[in-house]
Design a protein with these regions (language model features):
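Helix-to-loop junction immediately C-terminal to a conserved catalytic motif
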Residues: 51
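Conserved ABC ATPase signature
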Residues: 105, 146-156
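Conserved ABC ATPase "signature" region
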Residues: 66-70, 75-80, 124-143
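ABC nucleotide-binding domain "signature motif"
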Residues: 57-68
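The feature captures the beta-strand-to-loop junction immediately N-terminal to the Walker
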Residues: 36-38
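Short coil-to-helix segment of the ABC ATPase nucleotide-binding domain corresponding to the Q-loop/switch region
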Residues: 106-114
Length: 157
């Protein structure tokens, strides 16, 4: 069975600060893993490296058995080989950011459907239908046409 996520010997530093030190882990499909650590220990950086919001200094990341292809640029920094591969893999991953990051000028529903329309290229009417279903699932469908400023902190999350 192919692993959902496999990380091999991942390293990431910011200047002289080594944040991720030769980390390896495997998560099988359906398996739940927890990443626990103190503030500043690299948990968010690890997730950002998996999504390539940050590029690791070295190591390999596999998503559903597929290696994210990286190469060194002229300065020796790792960069993705194929942006199409990055976009495709990102469309299969999810990440909840520490901050709410809702667009204040967009309604709740517009915030929910923005990524599916632009990243996954889902048709707007399909995204709206799915968006309402998701809002129903978390109990805030009645807030679909309101703006984030009208939601509680928990509802925004």
């Amino acid at each position: 069975m192919t692993n959902a996520l496999e990380i091999r010997n991942l390293k990431k530093s910011f200047g002289n600060l080594e944040v991720i030190k030769d980390l390896s882990l495997t998560a099988k499909k359906g398996e739940v893993i927890c990443i626990i650590g103190t503030s500043g220990s690299g948990k968010s950086t690890l997730l950002r490296c998996v999504n390539l919001l940050e590029t690791p200094d070295s190591g390999e990341v596999y998503v559903n058995g597929e290696l994210i292809k990286m190469k060194k640029d002229k300065n020796g920094k790792l960069i993705p080989v194929e942006q199409n591969q990055v976009d495709r893999i990102r469309s299969k991953l999810s990440m909840v950011f520490q901050d709410f990051n809702l667009w204040s000028h967009m309604t709740v529903l517009q915030n929910v459907i923005e990524a599916p329309i632009h990243v996954q290229k889902i048709e707007k009417n399909v995204a709206r239908k799915n968006g309402y279903l998701l809002l129903e699932k978390v109990g805030i469908a009645e807030k679909a046409d309101q703006y984030p400023s009208k939601l509680s902190g928990g509802q925004q999350q």
